[in-house]
Amino acid sequence: MDLQYYKIFKQKTSQGMVGLLRPLKKRGSENVFKLRLNHKSTPSATDYFFVQDEPAFPIFVFKIPKEVNYLLDHEFEVSKNMKQLTTYLPHFNTILEIKRDVKCHVPEKLCPQALDDPFAKYNCTRDVAIVEYIPSKTTLLEYILGTNFTRCTDSLIHQLILALFIAQQQVQFSHYDLHLENVLIRRCFKRTFFWYKFSYEHATFQRLILTNGLFPVIFDYGFAHSTNVEGSSYYNSLFFTNKGYTPMVFDDVVDFKTLLIRMAHLYHCPQKFKTLVASNFLKNPQLPYKVDRETGWIKSSDKSIARIVCTQMEEVLKDHLGAEYESNFIYKELEQIIDLFMVLIKLPLVETEFNVKELEYHVGTFVDEWGKIDAWFSHGFTDDKLNILKKIFTLVNELILEQSERSTKTTRQLVKRFQLAVYEILDQFGEFVHVQQLDYGSLFHSIVQLSEFIEHVAYKELTRHQTDYPSGGVTGWSLFTQIEQCTSSVEPYLFRLDDHIVLFDCIDQATSFFELKDVDIVESLNQCGTISNQIRLLDSLDLVDH
């Protein structure tokens, strides 16, 4: 499908630029962003029940990061796991594909007044994510603020924690940044019941929830963890680990924690949620640290892993470069460059044997060899230089992976392939680039060694973090059950003819749907006495339409 720019969201966002694409209306017109979506169409849970907010024509979201990094690759890896879940859970948004090396315009300051069609002109090159469109303008925060806490809110939260808990069991999902604005509210037929069937610790559980015509959808996996990130490049940032963002590992508590704490901070939040927050986090005697009452982040004077790396490398750079260190490209862009090294960090983290005494040598080699490339490009081309580095780091990663699969390749052959590929990279950014006296072997080796230094620090700090910031006896299961007690319906449901029931069978990984058309069945359900008995009766009947 060929798409073109439609509109841009002018709200401030840390995501960079976010907007909409629509099918191409007029071929040959200007400002067209053409994409061919090659993803295969797979059944979605929302295909099985009536959803009121579907747009009249296909719409897609685009995301352009404001910096050169690999964060979209990280989101995409997590999204692949979430795509698997969407067959039998309607609560997760997915990325459809990533378009590489798109020329676009990202303003230096992402203020609403500066945002316009980013594809009409360009000042940079970015990867662009094409994301499934959620046709909703209402976040969970906006819904709660507009209605306060009602039974409808309880239903939404109950659905949300079920989605989180099931995703934890299926793909070790941790969102890590789950706040009320990362959940959108979609609409369905008001008398729709969601029936969940899932397993935990080899036991089968079932839940039945009246949606009241509303269901939540989680999006934004920028800090998330799932099974897909294990065994691959890290792709993420290490700059927020001191706040509790550790997406290199699975955490079954963090999402319930941030969700509860952010809800409890709202003025009209019921006492039942505030009590949960106080007993589990704010006043838990087993927690040896404080958490922020507004965000749920860890309160700590610790530096993040990336800040520790940055500080050590800055000191080496100052000594190596002397008085002119402040004008050096590597020094000025060190934070972004550290994020670029993440492509060489593999999960799970392992303890490396890096000799810290050799850090000065490897930093010096990297800076000196890169400087020979840097000299070919003017000082105003920061974005191009970062993209060159990104491509070089990606190349190093690919060659290392290839070498591990084909152990017969010699170092000389590896360096030669690296050299030829670097030629091709530089040709993308300038004509007749001929770098003088560049030692490709030394550049390659320094990049590998610095990535091992970063992993050395990351492993050490993550190990310390897990010791210093324990869960305080709180588990994902305990939080899930406590929140359920606050949100689940106590009284049995009063069913009506034509009610819609959607079964999300997370064990057999399938969705099915039926309408209540039989008066006798409706009467039997209404005489069950408890929701558990209603579920048992539904489970005993062969009511599935499709």
From Swiss-Prot:
InterPro entries linked to this entry: Kinase-like_dom_sf
Family: Belongs to the IIV-6 098R family.
Protein name: Uncharacterized protein 038R
